């Protein structure tokens, strides 16, 4: 009998804890996020502490990571986007390393849970909202009323633009979660199907799994990149009010 492909997404307590009647257990999801946070920090520290004129491999990797993200921020948001670079780099590292960690056998993919991806999306949403109001004051609300709109159409457009603005963190989080869940379920089903086959028919499915693992690793990086691109687009809208 094949194992339930959804069982890999179960959040399980590792260290049961309770305080004031609330469950604050340390779970496999929390451990995975802590591990990724430490790994991302160590990666940056290793890359940039004691940097040299002739870079080491880690320093070269860190410089590529830095330059690609700073160029992304500058090309989408503009010169004023430099202040958002730490946020964008952090999001990219956290999501990409979290996705890659999920490819390790028996590791937990925390980006497969909407509560995690929605929390990340809400960080971006809150940043855009707070910065937009701080920078433009009441002028921020002109974002919901496109220029040269007939007066009779204005109320409808305000409602539509407001709904689009509010739905951004929902679409941002759902896109990432759906891709991670779909890819892992497909891999799980094919991998478990190989077990029931005779040795004569196993080479082709095994080759397919290897190809899918490589593709899933690519998707893991791509989804982190898409998340950061869309985050930059949302930030650009409030920086330039369009």
Swiss-Prot record:
Q: Which PROSITE patterns match?
A: ATPASE_A (PS00449)
User: Which GO cellular component does the record give, naming just one?
Assistant: plasma membrane
The record's section on InterPro entries has: ATP_synth_F0_asu (IPR000568), ATP_synth_F0_asu_AS (IPR023011), ATP_synth_F0_asu_bact/mt (IPR045083), F0_ATP_A_sf (IPR035908)
Q: Which domain of life is it from?
A: Bacteria
Query: What transmembrane ranges does the database entry give?
Result: 29-49, 84-104, 114-134, 140-160, 181-201, 206-226
Q: Which GO terms describe its molecular function?
A: proton-transporting ATP synthase activity, rotational mechanism
Q: What is the membrane topology noted in the UniProt record heading this document?
A: Multi-pass membrane protein
What are the alphabetically sorted keywords of the record? Answer: ATP synthesis, Cell inner membrane, Cell membrane, CF(0), Hydrogen ion transport, Ion transport, Membrane, Transmembrane, Transmembrane helix, Transport
Q: Does the keyword field hold Lipid biosynthesis? A: no
One matching Pfam family is ATP-synt_A
Asked whether the UniProt record includes Cell inner membrane among its keywords, one would answer yes
UniProt-listed SUPFAM superfamilies: F1F0 ATP synthase subunit A
CDD domains, alphabetically? ATP-synt_Fo_a_6
Q: Where in the cell is it found?
A: Cell inner membrane
Which HAMAP family has this protein been placed in?
A: ATP_synth_a_bact
- Output the NCBIfam families linked to this UniProt entry: ATP_synt_6_or_A, PRK05815.2-4
Q: What does this protein do?
A: Key component of the proton channel; it plays a direct role in the translocation of protons across the membrane.
UniProt-listed PANTHER family: ATP SYNTHASE SUBUNIT A
Q: How does it assemble?
A: F-type ATPases have 2 components, CF(1) - the catalytic core - and CF(0) - the membrane proton channel. CF(1) has five subunits: alpha(3), beta(3), gamma(1), delta(1), epsilon(1). CF(0) has three main subunits: a(1), b(2) and c(9-12). The alpha and beta chains form an alternating ring which encloses part of the gamma chain. CF(1) is attached to CF(0) by a central stalk formed by the gamma and epsilon chains, while a peripheral stalk is formed by the delta and b chains.
Protein family according to the UniProt entry: Belongs to the ATPase A chain family.
Supply the name of the protein: ATP synthase subunit a
Organism of origin is Orientia tsutsugamushi (strain Ikeda)
From the broadest rank down, the organism's phylogenetic lineage runs: Bacteria, Pseudomonadati, Pseudomonadota, Alphaproteobacteria, Rickettsiales
What gene is behind this protein? atpB
